[in-house]
């Protein structure tokens, strides 16, 4: 069977869905990765996954650009004639679902978090509901990463309950993210906190910096580190100016970006994620796999990854 796997970035497919794509290929299926081309498209090709570039305006709200993306998906699906479409991230879910509905192609979607549009009620949330209802209303199956997100979608009438299921997260390779033997680092030094995330305000970056500033004022011997993609295409992106200002102030250290967080996580004493809302956060699963305590917001998704008072604190 030919299976199309679509996302808003090739990076996402390489980072989170490569093992799935390889398992499907090993089972005898033909797998096609669909996303806008970025620096990770060649990595997918090197792994044996055929990549198709479908440009899209990932974070924009232009109806014209979104209609163009829908047209590109329709054209691709007609040409490829897949047996099933797997959709990840917002626009490939919404517009991929619409295209599959019109062409009679089975579609399976993974809603990994509800995002900014569902945090505040208003025009944006009403438009998001309309798009999701149209895109996912006839889906073959829709997976959510926590029960709260599933209940909200079903309660709003966006998807029938009968096609929904909860798949708690993307999973973690326990062999790759294994606890390190011995001390976490050579020098005891101050306590090290680290936050791994795309640098957007919804991840609680502002709260993390404010907490770091307050604890430093109180005299706590600690280092506060940030790691993740900066200047992402998102309405709530943290600016480089803000990060540079915090670094100059001495409140946080910005480590940059990496494809492998294990060495940084191994050096940390505690992993922090004060996010406003998540599906099931991968960084907390990876931290738990490496036996690192965590501090997370008592918010949808985060609370599913932490046993309060045992593996960390909410």
Residue ranges and their predicted role:
Residues 35-39, 196, 223-238:
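Glycosyltransferase donor-sugar binding loop
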Residues 14-16, 64-71, 106-108, 116-138:
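Nucleotide-sugar donor phosphate/pyrophosphate-binding loop at the beta->alpha transition
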Residues 262, 269, 291:
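A short alpha->beta transition loop at the rim of the catalytic pocket in nucleotide-sugar-dependent
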Residues 183-203, 208-213, 225:
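Conserved donor-binding/catalytic core segment of Leloir-type glycosyltransferases
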Residues 52, 133-180:
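Donor nucleotide-sugar binding/catalytic pocket of nucleotide-sugar-dependent glycosyltransferases
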Residues 87-93, 111:
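Short His-centered aromatic/hydrophobic patch
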Residues 257, 276:
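Aromatic "clamp/platform" in nucleotide-sugar-dependent glycosyltransferases that forms part
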Residues 293-296, 306:
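Short hydrophobic beta-strand element within catalytic cores of glycosyltransferases
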């Amino acid at each position: 069977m030919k299976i199309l796997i679509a996302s808003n970035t090739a990076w996402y497919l390489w980072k989170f869905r490569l093992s799935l794509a390889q398992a499907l290929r090993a089972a005898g299926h033909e797998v096609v990765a669909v996303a806008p081309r970025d620096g990770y498209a060649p990595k997918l090709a090197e792994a044996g996954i055929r990549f198709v570039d479908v440009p899209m305006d990932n974070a924009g709200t232009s109806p014209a650009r979104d209609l163009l993306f829908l047209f590109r998906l329709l054209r691709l699906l007609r040409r490829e004639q897949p047996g099933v479409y797997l959709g990840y991230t917002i626009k490939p879910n919404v517009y991929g679902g619409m295209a599959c509905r019109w062409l009679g192609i089975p579609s399976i979607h993974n809603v990994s978090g509800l995002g900014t549009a569902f945090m505040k009620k208003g025009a944006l949330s009403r438009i998001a509901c309309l798009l999701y209802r149209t895109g996912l209303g006839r889906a073959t199956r829709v997976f959510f990463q926590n029960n709260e997100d599933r209940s909200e979608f079903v309660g709003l009438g966006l998807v029938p309950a009968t096609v929904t299921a909860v798949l708690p997260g993307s999973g973690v390779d326990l062999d790759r993210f294994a606890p390190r033997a011995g001390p976490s680092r050579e020098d005891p030094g101050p306590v090290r906190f680290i936050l791994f995330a795309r640098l957007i305000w919804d991840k609680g970056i502002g709260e993390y910096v404010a907490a770091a500033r307050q604890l430093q004022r109180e005299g706590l011997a600690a280092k506060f580190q940030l790691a993740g993609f900066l200047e992402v295409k998102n309405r709530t992106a943290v600016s480089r100016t803000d990060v540079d200002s915090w670094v100059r102030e001495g409140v946080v250290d910005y480590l940059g970006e990496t494809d492998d967080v294990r060495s940084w996580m191994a050096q940390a004493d505690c992993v922090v994620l004060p996010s406003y809302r998540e599906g099931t956060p991968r960084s907390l699963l990876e931290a738990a796999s490496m036996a690192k305590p965590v501090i997370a917001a008592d918010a949808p998704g985060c609370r599913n990854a932490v046993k309060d008072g045992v593996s960390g604190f909410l």
